[in-house]
Amino acid sequence: DQKAKYIFLFIGDGMGYNHVAATESYLSYKEGKLGGEMLTMSQFPYYGVATTFSANDYVTDSSAAGTAIASGEKTNNYALGVDPEGKPVKSMAYDLQEDGYNIGIVTTVAVNHATPGAFYASSASREDYYDISKQILKSEFEFFAGSGFLDFKGKKGEEAPIDAYLEDNGYEVSYGLKEFKKEAAGKDRVILCQESNKAENAGNYISSGAIAEDATLAEMLSCGIEHLGDKKPFFIMCEGGDIDWGGHGNKIMPVVTNVLSFD
């Protein structure tokens, strides 16, 4: 059987039908209609339904959900890339890497946050951000993009800046699109972060609207496609992570704008 050359997995973090329906209602209202406007994702020819409970709770969190999507294994809330007993589980990204695919991980939130982390890291706690970041090296994935890093210098602020650590070990870390286009060309492994988070912690569960100089999700995805190229097959996980953050803050317009950006 012929295998797909390009595989994209899009994840709307914390997104359910209610978020989609609210966004479509907003679009219909703008057109002066009572319903009828549909997002691109709502027009796909096939739908599937899945249970979302984790191994220890009816309500999952992003690390347990991300692990389930990445590996097919349900786990406990707060666990990342491990089973309920703490044994590492294998992400589909590693399976595809072994099958000759280049790998890209793209998100609107920190690259060491729960959903992206589930595709390359294993940790008993999703909040061990610095250690999760260090596991980027083990992955050897070719492209990462996100807002930046949580715990930039470790939990206590006493570790080496994580971008310097990663650069010392073979990754090019670029902040913003201009820096990416200038520095990433010809590099094997690249991490694209937002210009607004250079040399500092990325924001966490903050949904205050896009920062003007920051790249959009579509722009980061385009950079990933460009970097991975067409010589080898590739897999990209692309997450609209701040959809969830708008939900945490009970802020409907950030939810709507982030769903639209994701769509």
PLM features per residue range, with description:
Residues D1-K155, A160-A184, D188-R189:
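N-terminal catalytic scaffold of extracellular/periplasmic and nuclease hydrolases
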Residues Y78-L80, I211, M253:
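Short, contiguous strand/loop micro-motifs
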Residues G176, F180-Q194, M220-G241:
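Active-site regions of oxyanion-processing enzymes, predominantly non-cytosolic
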Residues S125, A212-L221, N258-F262:
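Phosphate/oxyanion-binding active-site loops and adjacent basic polyanion-contact surfaces
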Residues S139-F141, L150, D188, C193-A212:
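Formylglycine-dependent
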Residues A114-F119, N197-G209, G224-I225, G229-D263:
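Active-site His/acidic residue clusters
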